[in-house]
Amino acid sequence: MSLSRMPKPASAEGAPPETRYEFKPFRYSSHFWILKALDHERAPVKILDVGTAAGYLGKIWTARGHHVTGIEFDAATAEKARGYYESFQVTDLETFAFPYRREFDYIVFADVLEHLRDPAAALRRCMPALKESGKIVISVPNVANWVVRLSLLLGKFDYMDRGILDRTHLRFFTLRSLEKMMEEVSCDVVEVTPTPLPMQLVFPFTESKFFAPFHEALYAITCGWKTLLAYQFVITAGPRDSWQFPVLSEEMMPSRKLTKQ
């Protein structure tokens, strides 16, 4: 079985986003590290969750007392998610103007940027929403993973229903290209965390505590050769001191207040 796809009894092609992209709560997953990036926040903070899916992360952050705003493209998925957020907007991320000014402590793009035609443009548009001391947390798949490299060596670049070569991915990232994009949007990457191959999804029986040493070893090896072995990268970045907010025209500003609907 290819480790680049997530096994399911039936094809996930055309499935709703909430079933295509399930919550990965297990240790060392991208969701594990995204949640951990905010674990030190004891007082409530303001979070903008961009691309909420079914609200997995928003539900946890809200339960912890944080103030969370959600943005989602898919209307059906949004209906499942909006109850976990103080405010919510269903919109196209390719054009959304982010009508906030220095409002959020964190902006999170969890498995989102690879689905956009121009992820750098989306990042630039969201930057005015971030407080001067705020952070952006991003997770993207690593197209330079050894599984994809081996497939290329064999003359294959086959899209899958899930995984690194998900059919819905429009952009592909290596660690270098991800860091370059953050530089282009005037952000400094302050932390990079690789995630190992999600063996718990490929082989569910490895969720047993018996396999904990195996997952510890797999993560340690992944950290040692992250550009080759990482399944995903989770980065934390902050705006540079010299970053200037762009001036938005009236046409770019949304016409209504963003509230839970």
Regions inferred by a protein language model and the residue ranges of each:
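A SAM-dependent methyltransferase catalytic signature shared across enzymes that methylate proteins
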Residues: R176-T193
